[in-house]
Structures are given as C-alpha cells and as structure tokens.
Amino acid sequence: MELWFTENQDENLRFSLKVKETLVVEKTPYQHLAILDTYQFGRVLTLDGILQTTEKDEFVYHEMIVHVPLFTHKNPKSVLIVGGGDGGSVREVLKHPSVERVVLAEIDEAVVRNSKKYLPTISQALDDPRVEIMIGDGIKYVNEHKNEFDVVIVDSTDPIGPAVGLFTSDFYKAVYECLKEDGIIVAQTESPFIYGKLINKLSKMFKEIYPITKAYIATIPTYPGSLWTFTMGSKKYDPEEVDINSIPRIDTKYYTPEIHKAAFVLPKFVKDIFDEV
C-alpha cells in the first residue's frame, strides 16, 4: 500500500509527496510534528500538516534568509534567530567568520530535539559553542533585549498557530529596539500567489518602522506557489548598494553575489503587491 503526505496549501490547492517511512510523529504542547522520509525530497519536517523543510531544497530558503542580510551588514557579530528550530539558519549564519554569537529562540523544544535526531544535515551546527538555544517565546525574548543584535532573522512558520504574533507591527517595532543602531531584520513573508494581501500588509508595517525596507525573492519548490518572498528592514545599510565584488565566496548551493543582486529584481506583480498603498 502506498503512503502519501498531503499538505492542504489552501482550500483549493494540495501538495503531495510519496512517503517511504514515517520516522517520528509527536503531539507537542504547541503543534503536531512529523518527520517523514519521502522518495522525491528526502526527509521532511511537517508541523500541523504543513511542510516546513526538506533535505532536498532546504538550502535555498536557509541560504537566502541568512546570507542576504548578513552580507548587507558590514560586520555582523551577534545574530538572533526567532523560530528556525530545525537549525538550518544557524548552520548558514556560522559560515560568516565575523559572527561570535547566535541565539536561537524556538518555542517548541520538540522541533530542536527531533531535528537533531532525524535531520542531521540541517541541524548540524546546533551544538556549536557560539550557539545559545533559548526554548521559549521569541516575542518575549525580543521584548526583553534592547540594542543587542546586529541581525534578527524571523525564521517563522506560516501565520497560524504559535507564529501569529510574529506577523504584527508590535513585534517588528520590538525588533527595531532589539537591534543595534545599524541593525537589520529579515523575515520570511510567504508566497505572492497565496498570501498577496498579507505581504502587502507586512510591507506597510516594515516601511513605517524601518528607514530602508526591501523585498527579495527565491524559488523553493515545496513551498506554496514555489515563488517565495523575504522582507528586509534596515536601519542603515541598503542591500541593493552592496558591492557584490566584495562579497566573499562561501560554501553555498544557491546564494552567490550575483544572486544577491538579482533577488531584488521583482516580477511586476510582486513589486505591485509590495508597493500598493
């Protein structure tokens, strides 16, 4: 008998993967977690039936949410990651030799624990001595820390369940205070094909708070619509003014200096979503 995982991406759209083996299923205090081994995309992490990451294409998301802001900042030493308990963003952050401290604020310890056990290629950096894992509410952590981080990465799930509070103006204002005077925030801001209204709303929030607000894109096959957006808010540095010739080559599969520049060239319909008043 064939076993398939199916994600209901919205009321009219489903995405399915054929499953080799169910590795773990756990009902945590916050959500329903499963890690499955699939034929096409390797091991995958799902939360509440929504695909979070896969071994085959995770590098696109993690490289783009990390390297674009960290190479925009002139000298990132301290980085806060809100969410991201699978460890992929931590792995990418630690490719930057200037980084001295990474705080991972993850609300659900089961995500960290199971990722370490079943997703070693993604979670491999979580035991690095520069990493502090804070199991708890990332919003509360942000509110309690002022002028502390060079870069804040909001590596959240979709805007449902535990992540709802990470898509609010109050949270982005708190991040502004959490950042140093030349700090940068980047957040994953969903698919323009599915969440156009939300993206426009978030863009307006960022523009009200951060003097420099830019959107960029990447293609992630297993995410709804495949085309994915990220929104960056910066107090000082413009990501489009980075001299790409000065960006050092690091070990990546998707991100390059050329991709850094190209990612900010938005299709017209995406630009319209971000620019609509």
Curated annotation (Swiss-Prot):
Q: Which reaction does it catalyse?
A: S-adenosyl 3-(methylsulfanyl)propylamine + putrescine = S-methyl-5'-thioadenosine + spermidine + H(+)
Give the positions the UniProt entry annotates as the active site: 155 (proton acceptor)
Q: Which residues form the PABS domain?
A: 2-235
UniProt enzyme class = transferase
According to its UniProt record, the EC number is 2.5.1.16
Indicate which residues the UniProt annotation says bind spermidine.
62, 86, 155-158
Q: Where in or outside the cell is it found? A: Cytoplasm
Cellular component terms, GO, for this chain's entry? cytosol
Q: Which PROSITE patterns match?
A: PABS_1, PABS_2
Q: How does it assemble?
A: Homodimer or homotetramer.
Would you tell me the protein name for this molecule? Polyamine aminopropyltransferase
Source organism: Thermoanaerobacter pseudethanolicus (strain ATCC 33223 / 39E)
